[in-house]
Amino acid sequence: MADFLLYALLAGLSLALVAGPLGSFVVWRRMAYFGDTLSHAALLGVALGFALDVSPALAVTVGCLSLAILLVTLQQRQPLASDTLLGILAPSTLSLGLVVLSFMHDVRIDLMAYLFGDLLAISTTDLAWILGGSALVLLLLAVLWRPLLAVTVHEELAMVEGLPVAGLRMALMLLIAVVIAVAMKIVGVLLITSLLIIPAAAAQRHARSPEQMALGASLLGVTAVCGGLAMSWFKDTPAGPSIVVCAAVLFLLSLALPKR
């Protein structure tokens, strides 16, 4: 197997494994729009990375984490509804990123690769970044699984039981930010949340427990990655969108199957 294809497969599979349980929380807590806002802000992180001459991956990670903290702070202090606030920040950060990039005449940037991913162009450094970020998020999810689940099921009861609800909510948002940052190279900023939401939504119909849903979402994500890479290899289609198309097909198939 060619090195670039092996790197793409390892990166895609690692992201699919972590997107399963994390995407389940996104679906349960109806945080899809939050994920969209962070993914749009990732392009601003890319632009600032080039402007400040730092690694785009590092700039995107710092940018997504900073925006997640800003969102939580604004939600607590502003009278605006959450969806209104997200609706303002999502297009604003994406547009600002595009404007900043337009001023960089001396920097050659493949904008399509950042918007829709360039999985087959992953380098050794990119792979290490993706594997490390995915492993960290999986480890933290394993540690925080029960408390996060308790907060998701009933926040008031979790608060009565002494769980740090605000801290856990912030932790979940930061984990989403990390995954979005590492996933940008795979499916691009415009398609990142689809890899979080679609497998989890497909698994939700047929799972009998939260753990079953998380595992099912991971397996569906792995299937979508393998199918998307195969389509890209044999039909010369873009890898990121091909993965999302395969995930969408799996979701449609889940609708056709009887609900458990």
How should each PLM-predicted stretch be described?
Residues M1, L115, L119-L120, L220-L257:
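C-terminal binding/interaction regions
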Residues M1-L17:
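Membrane-interfacial amphipathic/re-entrant helices at transmembrane-helix boundaries
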Residues L6-Y7, Q78, L86-R146, L174:
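Transmembrane helix-bundle core of multi-pass membrane transporters
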Residues A8, P56-C64, D83-G87, L131, ...:
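Loop-to-transmembrane alpha-helix initiation sites
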Residues S24-V107, A203-G216, S232-K235, P258-K259:
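Short loop segments and helix-boundary regions at transmembrane helix junctions
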Residues A41-A51, L89-L101, A121, V165-A177, ...:
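Small-residue-rich segments of transmembrane alpha-helices in multi-pass membrane proteins
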Residues L127-P199:
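Helix-loop-helix "hairpin" substructures at the membrane interface of multi-pass membrane proteins
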Residues L190-P241:
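Transmembrane alpha-helical segments in multi-pass inner-membrane proteins
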